[in-house]
Amino acid sequence: MADGKAGEEKPEKPQRAGAAGGPEEEAEKPVKTKTVSSSNGGENSSRSAEKRSAEDETADLPTKPTKISKFGFAIGSQTTKKASAISIKLGSSKPKEPVPTLAPKTLSVAAAFNEDEDSEPEEMPPEAKMRMKNIGRDTPTSAGPNSFNKGKHGFSDNQKLWERNIKSHLGNVHDQDN
């Protein structure tokens, strides 16, 4: 991963397999390095741009060589500082809001529909009243889901109606003959 980083330089001498890279070797040759966190792959750094530029400027100046032990603890110290900074931010940036008290409900159903008790109910025309009134068998309109086969004289069975008409005609004819 660190092969393509711009700020890293590789040492000119290859390290021996048995040699430990201690502070003595760093004293011989200063090497610019950037700390890379393994948790995020080096993509997002928690340091700000100001801190990075300040460290880069101080790294350019000849100073005492840094010890490797600092690098070992740098990752752990960054995470602890980050965690404490988060807890401070959460505690200080969240002001306590007063609990809003609910207003007592004064609305009733009539108020919700803007119905005034003083106003008179709407007058219906007599035609509409007559259509809505149920007169029984003589209901003028056959409307609704249960009004199949309902005529002006109520529910009718055509077969029975035909039989009644035949009997009445026969009765009339029989009476006329007498």
UniProtKB/Swiss-Prot annotation:
Protein's cellular compartments: Nucleus
Ranges of Basic and acidic residues composition bias in the record: 1-15, 160-178
Modified residues (N-acetylalanine): A2
Polar residues bias (residue ranges): 139-149
Post-translational modification: Ubiquitinated; mediated by UHRF2 and leading to its subsequent proteasomal degradation.
Transmembrane segments: none
Composition bias type Low complexity, residue spans: 37-47
Residue list for modification Phosphothreonine: T139
Modified residues (N6-acetyllysine): K64, K150, K152
Superkingdom classification of source: Eukaryota
Residues with Phosphoserine modification: S53, S77, S87, S119, S147
GO CC, alphabetical: nucleus
GO biological process, one term: protein ubiquitination
Region (Disordered): 1-84, 134-178
Main subcellular location: nucleus
Keywords from the UniProt entry: Acetylation, Cell cycle, Nucleus, Phosphoprotein, Ubl conjugation
Complex formation: Interacts with UHRF2/NIRF.
Reported function: May be involved in cell cycle regulation.
Protein name stated in the entry: PEST proteolytic signal-containing nuclear protein
Gene symbol of the encoding locus: PCNP
